[in-house]
Amino acid sequence: MGRYLVKWVDLSYKDCTWEKKEVIADKEMIAAYERRQHIPEWKLAPLKSKAERVALGEKSMLKFKEGKVSASEGAEAKTLRPYQWEGFRWLKNNYNEGKNSILADEMGLGKTIQVISLMEHVVHKWTWAWRVRCSMQTQQPILVIAPLSTLGFWRREIESWTSLNVIMYHDNEGGKEVRRLIEKYEWYYGNGQVPESVDHEVFKFDVLLTTYEITIADVDALMP
């Protein structure tokens, strides 16, 4: 690929520019982009039998033993505090039983981390449950709706604690046109410049961050 569409830090999506590979100094960013261009096998893996799903769930919990969550393969895992681990297990059990949950701890006790741990667990460790519940043959992403002032915090924490691909469906300087740009280049696998190459069946991102107002405005685009 000769050029990359660059989203500059702290600038709007409308300020994106096409740049040649050789002038981009951060080669790790290029490598990360290239990795995101390939559909992971786990997103397309066939649904398993009930016995296989139970075994997968047990194996999953072993990986999460002691509340360790890793941002990437081979990276040093971060550890949840005991009460955060207990909160995560409660969220997980409610999710498995199809129950809604509300965390109402005081500020600063790690509610966000507990929810993020559940996201990592659901997407990478408990994939089958998500797909069976949604009757989907491919993995579906997670939608996080939060106040605008907290979106940056959510993104930093998700990137710090997990290996999930998270994008922010919001732009301070752009309206619907900019959101269509995000959808065109960030949502699906394939080349946004070549419509026929885009696979609309599998989402590239794992987590979409946005606000309540944008959710209402773009409800048709965000509906599963």
Task: Tell me the role of every PLM-derived stretch.
Residues 47-224:
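ASCE P-loop NTPase motor core, strongest for the SF2 helicase catalytic module
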